[in-house]
Amino acid sequence: MSAAEIKDKVYDIIVSKMGVNKDQITPESKFADDLGADSLDTVELIMELENEFGVQIPDEDAEKIGTVQQAIDYIVNKK
């Protein structure tokens, strides 16, 4: 899976899980500040990313993923 495909899939997951429009999402979007995620939303999002991409994201790594681009980069580096 290419980085572009991963980005598209991450965006789709964010739209599905967080109820935002795709045009509201940028690589710099912060899950909490810009997209309105609370801590439960963030946990659910991380779990969905793990399921979708077949990666394990330890809690200490998940805490460092605060933006859309950080999530994409993490998955690209794990694939």
UniProtKB/Swiss-Prot annotation:
InterPro entries: ACP (IPR003231), ACP-like_sf (IPR036736), PP-bd_ACP (IPR009081), Ppantetheine_attach_site (IPR006162). PROSITE patterns: CARRIER, PHOSPHOPANTETHEINE. Residues 4-79 form the Carrier domain. GO terms for molecular function: acyl binding; acyl carrier activity. It is found in: Cytoplasm. Its main location: cytoplasm. Coiled coil: none annotated. One of its GO terms (biological process) is lipid A biosynthetic process. GO terms for cellular component: cytosol; membrane. The modification O-(pantetheine 4'-phosphoryl)serine is found at residue 39. Pathway: Lipid metabolism; fatty acid biosynthesis. Keywords: Cytoplasm, Fatty acid biosynthesis, Fatty acid metabolism, Lipid biosynthesis, Lipid metabolism, Phosphopantetheine, Phosphoprotein. 4'-phosphopantetheine is transferred from CoA to a specific serine of apo-ACP by AcpS. This modification is essential for activity because fatty acids are bound in thioester linkage to the sulfhydryl of the prosthetic group. Carrier of the growing fatty acid chain in fatty acid biosynthesis. Belongs to the acyl carrier protein (ACP) family. NCBIfam families: acyl_carrier, PRK00982.1-2, PRK00982.1-3, PRK00982.1-4, PRK00982.1-5. This is Acyl carrier protein. It comes from Chlorobaculum parvum (strain DSM 263 / NCIMB 8327) (Chlorobium vibrioforme subsp. thiosulfatophilum). The lineage of its organism: Bacteria, Pseudomonadati, Chlorobiota, Chlorobiia, Chlorobiales. The gene is acpP.
